[in-house]
């Protein structure tokens, strides 16, 4: 892992730790801050070593063998070879919402996950375009930061839920407790916003890069553009209802569109702009679509 990636990972962990500690202070003063800092250290350790397993478990994703999904394995192996990385493991997510993501702290520990809905929606060329995009995230070492961000942002959201429950069911009788109520309200409002802004900082530019790298790996920018349009339309019609919004930035298209902050603070560039960039890449490759 290069120095630049170590620095980016360290900055991400530090920022999310600060958010966690801030929530802890708002919830419980100095004691809450100490507990939150301890939790942050534990979550940083867990997120580095086990974040891929955590994310896969969130979506009940199942690692599949070549015998179970021969064509999918063939595509992943071919594109990984063209990208010059080890073949990732392959997982299928049991949902009809079409989407895909990659996870893992390094190319040797990586997993490419696709949903059942994606396999049904796309043709072979489009599927290659999507998988090439995910392979590019692995090649560009985005998956470590993306997955750590998902796990730590998930921890932040758990604390926010705790703050919400405390606000609803707590007993606040004197003026001193009014400060606690204000703290809880601030935590509920500001913490998700902070986590989202941090996700934005690591996501948008990397999506453009993965689109470009993936298009050049597969040689089919038009197929990726077509896949993005299909997935975008499907997600708008039927967004993912079960899952962790903290993982939104990991997917090729935000699957939670329409049910949270996603429209105001999108973790992805507009699909139209991504397709326009793919058109330019296609022209460079002598492809018109």
UniProtKB/Swiss-Prot annotation:
Record Pfam families: Peptidase_M48
Residue positions binding Zn(2+): 133, 137, 207
Keyword terms, alphabetized: Cell membrane, Hydrolase, Membrane, Metal-binding, Metalloprotease, Protease, Transmembrane, Transmembrane helix, Zinc
Subcellular location: Cell membrane
GO cellular component: plasma membrane
Membrane topology, record value: Multi-pass membrane protein
Cofactor comment text: Binds 1 zinc ion per subunit.
Gene3D superfamilies: Metalloproteases ('zincins'), catalytic domain (3.30.2010.10)
Domain of life: Archaea
A GO BP annotation: proteolysis
Main location: membrane
Keyword check for Protease: yes
Catalytic residues (UniProt): 134
Cofactor(s) the protein requires to work: Zn(2+)
UniProt EC number: 3.4.24.-
Residues of the signal peptide: none
One MF annotation (Gene Ontology) recorded for this entry: metalloendopeptidase activity
Family membership: Belongs to the peptidase M48B family.
Protein name: Protease HtpX homolog
Phylogenetic lineage: Archaea, Methanobacteriati, Methanobacteriota, Thermococci, Thermococcales
